């Protein structure tokens, strides 16, 4: 796209309550609860657009907005209870929201994959106003869930390199997705930015506070480093778990490419995190000859030399003898413990 076609529109980081499916006794009960959540989210989007105005063209939902996260369930149990099919009724209902309201809808959830029946992935999906899925990003760094990195060779065989850091060139700019705590990793955002991403849609469910938190600091940093917008939606509380409801609440925000917070929500379900996204601003900043143009000054070849020598978190750790392994409950903690021990042995930490 050229500057003459650079769009300006309103983006909404919808801070919605997450009603976790952990207490559900069967997959059928969980699916019914998820569909009820979609009905509620649809009503929240309708009310928000009616209040804000028809300029809303991008709505970002919180992380795992329909399910919450696994709390003691095995991989097989969580896959059956909470992971949805890419062509399932939940996706169809979300696509209808996007088409009915003429928006790009970004959402996050656990999903199945026919290539990996032993696993599930946490996916970020963007649906355009026609109801088509224009972006699917699978979370690459996760403490307690499988990721494409854990089965990297097999994943690349199935989907190719471009599936790792996808960028969608849309009518509202070039979009990419960052999942939850991945906002803390500069490389995740940067590898999207070097493929042209101008807007990071960030679905999260995180501890927030009036004080500076690591993730909130990171949102500003990722915007400044990459001269990109960050549209970050947090949960507006979570029910159905032993964790107090407001622990993952408040702080949904929109950050512009200069690191300026344009809008931010307080506690509870809220549509207050909405603001104008001006794609022309991002493009002007990226094409400006200036010290502040950090994206244009990145010595990527230099980084690549040193990164190639580094060995920290292993790839393919859910592969054994060419076969995908279903992770045991202790797998993720055991893996991190082994990484820490290896770093200590080498004198890195």
Q: What are the roles of these predicted feature ranges?
A:
Residues 2-16, 167-176:
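Beta-strand-turn-beta hairpins that frame and shape the catalytic cleft
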Residues 20-36, 151-153:
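Acidic/histidine-rich helix-loop elements
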Residues 31, 35, 39-138, 145, ...:
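Cys-nucleophile CN-hydrolase/nitrilase-fold catalytic domain and related Cys-dependent amidase chemistry
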Residues 86-106, 174, 180-276, 291:
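CN hydrolase (nitrilase-like) catalytic-core segments centered on the catalytic cysteine
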Residues 107-109, 122-126, 166-168, 252-254, ...:
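Short beta-strand scaffold segments in enzyme catalytic cores
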Residues 113-198, 208-221:
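Active-site catalytic loop in hydrolytic enzyme cores
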Residues 234-349:
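C-terminal beta-strand edge segments of enzyme domains
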